[in-house]
């Protein structure tokens, strides 16, 4: 580049110094400074910082060009000040040699005859100055090819100077511009006529150039011409030809050249011989390679054997490659780290992972350690093959070799384990966690893809707290998660119903300065809606609008659906209007959600009207608000839409209409899916139409849908309800025949059914069997079993089961305590019942129904109803404790344990301001106190009762009057009687 700039500067004048009339010493300082800048701009120093000792002609030099213009702007300014040099150009280096080269080039280029008297006279002054660099520079400055040849010939004639290989190469490069271009005959003739020796060397150089360029045909033609002129190819030419053919995998051609070379009594150099031996081994001819060594009288060294081993690995001759290690040792030529690494990489490239283990152990025993890059490749290979255990061991081997595992290898291992959803198991996840802990200790982070995969695996294994902490730990190590990473982790937590952790992570995300997008907000809104936490979902909905994040149709649909399921139809309609006003049009999912939501809100007729309008009916005015933006070209009902309405019919026991809708689906070309069939079968079972349910099951099978656990569960549950255990057993046998193992729901239904018909021992055996088969009972199973033993009076067994629940990690819920306390009361174990109530309070159960609805999830409606809890659960703001207290107080009154009953009633008053539902309890307790001659206590309770808003029954007044008479308090009795008469018949 410097020479090009020099040429531009000097082409303006015949004399190179015409533009530099200022102080020469100052100019020299400027150019010295610019020389440093030029070196800095053109390349970066080599790794050892020994600038100037790197080979500028090395083909492997791939150093980056670093732009330091800004950093050294002050030096550019100084150049402008002193020399008026353009700061955007690299300042050339002017030397005496450059001046001479320009002078010679101008002289030669300006004349037709270089060998004329005038030219010879001018050039004579430069004879003693001729050198390799000067000649090359002149050749590059001369424009005309003929003049280039003339100067080349003239320079070769001068005493004290002889052309070198770089000069020949420069000449060939100037004459042959294209790789496939031949040298013009006139140029060859000119060189030949002048100096045959130079001509012969020139032809050799020409052959080598075409070999390096891969132009084999031209190289062979030039070789033929060289021979035609009775010149011998040089050793370098033969070596270059052989190397070129070997590089092109033309082993036969290389062999022919070698045979000719041998006939000329020439030997290959060491590099060419190694390449030849490698190529022979690569095609399995390793014996020929050894013969070649003997023929060439070459003494093999470590580099040579390493090359042979590399070729044998390419040929998949691994046993032979291993044998060459022994050959090396036999010749006192020890394998080094390059040898072992070559063998190791060769086995690795051919997927010979078993041999890799053997080679790795051998080389480490001999103190030869693979590089971190090779370790990374090994870990990747073993992870790909599924041997994650050995991949983890390689991390330990890295440490033994002095290499600390870093970012790449940890991400390879953890990413491979967590990236394969199908093969993941507990052992592999434990291994990933172990590697993750070590990675944290080393201060290394996962990339965002592997953070998402790792947290997904942790969530799937139920390790939600660990998944939640991963983000925080990664941030602590310098990892900066983006919105996408947070969204994926939030989605995993929400899908696992870990709403509290999702809430905390979402808030942490916002505190970190990240702005949630519509996708993230929609995940949170949809998940919290499905969990019944509508108020929080609405807060986020409002928040996203405030921060300028426009909700999409999915966001609106999730919230509308939640409002409808919560029977807040007005809120849903208002939100639907907002959606339309914001220009967000409902889609088929929205309308399907409307139908499902209205069904769950008990408005099946409204759902039918929406469905009719979707089908094209215009005479349905009551649902106009939902169809302001709906036209005939909009999407028709799909299988989800049909399924939502069909499920609504079944849940409201309108199974005939559900059956007709199923037929209508098929007529409209909408094929029912598994979910639709299962919903209809469950609906038919619920109303006792078991024969029709079996018919639908048969139809389902004919359409290619095998019975599922849900199908079998519906049938088994109903058969037990109608006390047809024989048919339930047949369904169970059919399940097992179809390799459909019962789950905890089916086992629980069977256990509950057996308990209901008094077969408690059989139910208990079934529960033991399900544990043996690896299906662990849940809280519903234990509660059903406790209820069964309670019905036959085995309270001790019930308590043992409660204790067993704790040891198994199954927490009892409200229904469990309610069932057990009820049976304790019925069997007279009032103290035990009271202790259970205290235990229930101490475990921090919620005080209102809204907080414990999720607690009873999993129990079917019939079971809850059989315990008398259905009405309690349906009333908002009713404390779940109150029913348990009432149950226990009533039984204490019957047992005449009035003091404890009074104390519990006082406790009840702390939970609720109004005790209207306790009217009968108050009246019973007043009557019992009067019968026990505790009239004063009865009057105090009467006073508290009226203050709480509980209206006394006439029986309470009668009990109080009788009690007063028995205690000879006649006047008080008459006053109370007078009060009653005025209350009943006011004046």
From Swiss-Prot:
One of its GO terms (cellular component) is mitochondrion. PROSITE patterns: PPR. The keyword Flavoprotein does not apply. It is found in: Mitochondrion. Its main location: mitochondrion. Gene3D superfamilies: Tetratricopeptide repeat domain (1.25.40.10). SUPFAM superfamilies: HCP-like. It holds the Pfam family PPR. Residues 1-42 form a transit peptide. Keywords: Mitochondrion, Repeat, Transit peptide. PPR repeats lie at residues 164-198, 199-233, 234-268, 269-299, 301-335, 336-370, 371-405, 406-446, 447-481, 482-516, 517-551, 552-586, 587-621, 638-672, 673-707, 708-742, 743-777, 778-812, 813-847, 881-915, 918-952, 953-987. Belongs to the PPR family. P subfamily. This is Pentatricopeptide repeat-containing protein At1g06710, mitochondrial. It comes from Arabidopsis thaliana.
């Amino acid at each position: 580049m410097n020479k090009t700039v020099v040429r531009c500067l000097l082409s303006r004048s015949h004399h190179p110094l015409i533009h530099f009339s200022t102080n020469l010493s100052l100019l020299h300082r400027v150019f010295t400074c610019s020389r440093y800048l030029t070196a800095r701009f053109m390349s970066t120093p080599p790794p050892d910082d020994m600038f100037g000792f790197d080979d500028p002609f090395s083909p492997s030099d791939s150093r980056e060009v670093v732009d330091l213009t800004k950093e050294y702007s002050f030096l550019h300014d100084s150049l402008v000040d002193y020399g008026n040099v353009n700061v955007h150009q690299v300042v050339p280096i002017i030397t005496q040699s450059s001046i001479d080269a320009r002078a010679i080039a101008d002289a030669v280029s300006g004349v037709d005859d270089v060998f004329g008297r005038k030219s010879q006279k001018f050039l004579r002054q430069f004879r003693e100055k001729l050198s390799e660099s000067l000649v090359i520079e002149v050749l590059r400055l001369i424009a005309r090819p003929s003049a280039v040849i003339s100067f080349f010939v003239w320079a070769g004639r001068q005493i004290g100077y002889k052309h070198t290989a770089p000069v020949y190469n420069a000449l060939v490069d100037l004459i042959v511009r294209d790789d496939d271009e031949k040298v013009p005959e006139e140029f060859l003739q000119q060189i030949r006529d002048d100096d045959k020796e130079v001509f012969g060397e020139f032809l050799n150089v020409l052959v080598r150039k075409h070999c390096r360029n891969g132009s084999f045909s031209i190289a062979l033609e030039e070789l033929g011409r060289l021979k035609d002129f009775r010149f011998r190819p040089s050793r370098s030419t033969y070596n270059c030809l052989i190397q070129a053919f070997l590089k092109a995998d033309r082993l036969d051609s290389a062999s022919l050249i070698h045979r000719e070379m041998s006939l000329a009594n020439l030997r290959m150099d060491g590099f060419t011989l190694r390449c030849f031996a490698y190529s022979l081994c690569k095609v399995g001819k390793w014996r020929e390679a050894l013969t070649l060594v003997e023929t060439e009288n070459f003494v093999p060294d470590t580099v040579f054997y390493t090359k042979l081993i590399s070729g044998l690995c390419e040929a998949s001759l691994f046993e032979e490659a291993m044998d060459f290690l022994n050959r090396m040792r036999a010749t006192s030529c020890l394998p080094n780290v390059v040898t072992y690494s070559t063998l190791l990489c060769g086995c690795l490239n051919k997927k010979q992972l078993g041999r890799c283990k053997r080679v790795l152990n051998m080389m480490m025993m001999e103190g030869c350690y693979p590089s971190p890059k090779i370790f990374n490749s090994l870990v990747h290979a073993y992870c790909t093959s599924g041997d994650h255990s050995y991949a983890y061991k390689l991390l330990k081997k890295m440490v033994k070799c002095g290499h600390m595992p870093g970012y790449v290898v940890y991400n390879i291992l953890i990413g491979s384990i967590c990236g394969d959803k199908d093969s993941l198991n507990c052992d592999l996840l434990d291994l990933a966690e172990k590697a993750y802990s070590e990675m944290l200790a080393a201060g290394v982070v996962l990339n965002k893809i592997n953070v998402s995969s790792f947290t997904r695996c942790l969530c799937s294994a139920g390790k939600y707290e660990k998944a939640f902490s991963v983000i925080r730990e990664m941030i602590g190590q310098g990892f900066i998660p983006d919105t996408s990473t947070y969204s994926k982790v939030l989605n995993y937590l929400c899908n696992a119903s870990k709403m509290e952790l999702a809430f905390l992570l979402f808030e942490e995300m916002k505190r970190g300065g990240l702005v949630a997008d519509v996708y993230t907000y929609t995940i949170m809104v949809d998940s919290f809606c499905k969990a019944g936490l509508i108020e929080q979902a609405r807060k986020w909905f409002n928040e996203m609008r405030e921060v300028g994040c426009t909700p999409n149709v999915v966001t609106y649909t999730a919230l509308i659906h939640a409002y409808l399921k919560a029977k807040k139809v007005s809120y849903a309609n208002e939100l639907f209007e907002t959606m339309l006003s914001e220009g967000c049009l409902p889609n088929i999912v929205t309308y399907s959600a409307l139908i499902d939501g209205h069904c769950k809100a008990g408005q099946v007729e409204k759902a039918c009207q929406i469905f009719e309008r979707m089908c094209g009916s215009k005479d349905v005015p009551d649902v106009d608000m939902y169809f302001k933006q709906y036209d005939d070209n909009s999407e028709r009902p799909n299988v989800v839409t049909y399924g939502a309405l069909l499920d609504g019919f079944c849940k409201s026991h309108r199974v005939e209409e559900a059956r007709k809708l199923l037929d209508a689906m098929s007529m409209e070309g909408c094929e029912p899916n598994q979910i639709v069939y299962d919903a209809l079968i469950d609906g038919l079972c619920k109303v006792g139409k078991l024969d029709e349910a079996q018919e639908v099951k048969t139809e389902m099978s004919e359409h290619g849908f095998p019975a599922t656990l849900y199908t079998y569960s519906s049938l088994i549950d109903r058969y037990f309800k109608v006390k047809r255990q024989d048919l339930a057993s047949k369904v169970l046998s059919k399940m097992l025949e179809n390799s459909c193992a019962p789950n905890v729901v089916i086992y629980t239904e069977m256990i509950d059914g057996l308990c209901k018909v008094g077969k408690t021992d059989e139910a208990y055996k079934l529960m033991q069997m399900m544990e043996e088969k690896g299906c662990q009972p849940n809280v519903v199973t234990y509660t059903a079993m406790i209820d069964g033993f309670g019905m036959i009076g085995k309270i001790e067994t019930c308590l043992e089961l409660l204790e067993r629940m704790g040891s198994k990690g199954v927490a009892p819920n409200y229904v469990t305590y309610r069932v057990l306390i009820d049976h304790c009361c019925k069997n007279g174990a009032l103290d035990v019942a009271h202790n259970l109530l205290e235990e229930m309070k101490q475990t921090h159960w919620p005080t209102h129904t809204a907080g414990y609805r999720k607690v009873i999830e999993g129990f079917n409606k019939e079971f809850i109803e059989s315990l008398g809890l259905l009405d309690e659960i349906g009333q908002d703001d009713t404390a779940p404790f109150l029913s348990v207290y009432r149950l226990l107080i009533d039984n204490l009154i019957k047992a005449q344990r009035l003091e404890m009953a009074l104390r519990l009633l006082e406790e009840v008053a702390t939970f609720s301001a109004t005790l209207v539902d306790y009217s009968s309890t108050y009246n019973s307790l007043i009557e019992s106190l009067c019968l026990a001659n505790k009239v004063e206590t009865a009057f105090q309770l009467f006073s508290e009762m009226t203050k709480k808003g509980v209206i006394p029954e006439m029986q309470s007044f009668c009990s109080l009057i009788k009690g007063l008479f028995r205690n000879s308090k006649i006047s008080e009795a008459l006053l109370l009687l007078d009060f009653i008469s005025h209350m009943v018949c006011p004046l």
